[in-house]
């Protein structure tokens, strides 16, 4: 006969031994949750970003005729033809000039945002909306409006110039010397709204105590702007510099809407993306067009990397 206490002991013993071998869960372990959340995003990036880049690199090493067919591997012949062409140098120069002019809108946006955020100013929200509204409009539609403004005969700009004594104002969008400058002014104007919103948010994050301390020390309003506002606003300025530079290298829609293809100024205003469009879809040389796309990608990567390396000298992260 088995004693009841013995049965109880035999029942408890395995539980105690089993619990002794149980592994304690690491409180810092998160398991597979990061992979579950990041995995779909990384898969989408690989499919929609990295794979097209790889396919474009492969296409740039091949020669395809206008009617398709079997592409022929030509190695770096497309790149040799591209770098020997004066069209590439002209397109790079036009793209850089446009980008530099549009970048001038950032200090202008800093001034506008600083005026909007002045203490005691009423209707700040209304001013932000008014500056941001052009950014919400369709770029092609706004470009058509500016095309009318730039019209050489009855455009608003030339009417104003004639009223102040300029007897022979230029035909802005037809003259090769003025067309790119006119498009760049449109790009500068179009960037103001987005810039002001970003900079206004940055200005609102600056503690007011810093201005009060600077005022007690006798700093003027201009010195406060230079020594307090600009350094603490530098992360927002750096972000806008990156975004504006990338947008400048992607110039196409404004040129296409305002200059067109039959304009005598078109060859002098052709950007890198315009050159890509012309080679790939007008001349039907997809291999050369792919080579232009790779050059654009490389230039944007180099310029962006240089900006990130240089930002350590002037960007202040508090």
Protein language model regions, located:
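A structural signal for multi-pass alpha-helical bundles of membrane permease subunits
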Residues: 30-318
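Short, Lys/Arg-rich, polar N-terminal cytosolic tail immediately upstream
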Residues: 1-28
């Amino acid at each position: 006969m088995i004693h009841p206490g013995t049965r109880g002991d035999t029942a408890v013993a395995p539980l105690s031994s089993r619990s002794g071998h149980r592994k304690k869960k690491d409180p810092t372990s998160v398991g597979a949750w990061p992979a579950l959340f990041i995995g779909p995003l990384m898969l989408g990036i690989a499919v929609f970003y990295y794979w097209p880049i790889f396919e474009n690199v492969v296409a740039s090493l091949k020669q395809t005729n206008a009617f398709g067919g079997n592409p022929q591997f030509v190695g770096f012949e497309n790149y040799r033809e591209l770098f020997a062409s004066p069209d590439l140098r002209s397109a790079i120069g036009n793209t850089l000039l446009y980008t530099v002019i549009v970048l001038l809108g950032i200090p202008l946006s800093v001034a506008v945002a600083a005026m909007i955020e002045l203490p005691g100013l009423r209707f700040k929200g209304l001013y932000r909306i008014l500056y941001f509204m052009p950014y919400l409009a369709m770029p092609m539609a706004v470009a058509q409006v500016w095309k009318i403004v730039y019209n050489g005969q009855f455009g608003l700009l030339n009417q104003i110039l004639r009223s102040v004594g300029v007897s022979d104002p230029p035909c802005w969008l037809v003259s090769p010397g003025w067309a790119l400058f006119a498009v760049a002014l449109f790009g500068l104007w179009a960037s103001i709204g987005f810039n002001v919103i970003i900079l206004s948010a940055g200005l609102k994050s600056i503690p007011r105590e810093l201005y009060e301390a600077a005022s007690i020390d006798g700093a003027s309003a201009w010195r406060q702007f230079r020594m307090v506002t600009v350094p603490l606003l530098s992360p927002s300025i750096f972000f806008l510099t990156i975004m504006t530079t990338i947008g400048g290298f992607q110039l196409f829609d404004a040129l296409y809407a305002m200059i067109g293809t039959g304009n005598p100024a078109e060859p002098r205003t052709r950007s890198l993306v315009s050159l890509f469009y012309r080679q790939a879809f007008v001349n039907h040389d997809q291999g050369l067009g792919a080579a232009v796309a790779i050059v654009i990608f490389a230039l944007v990567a180099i310029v962006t990397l240089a900006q990130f390396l240089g930002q350590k000298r002037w960007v202040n992260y508090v």
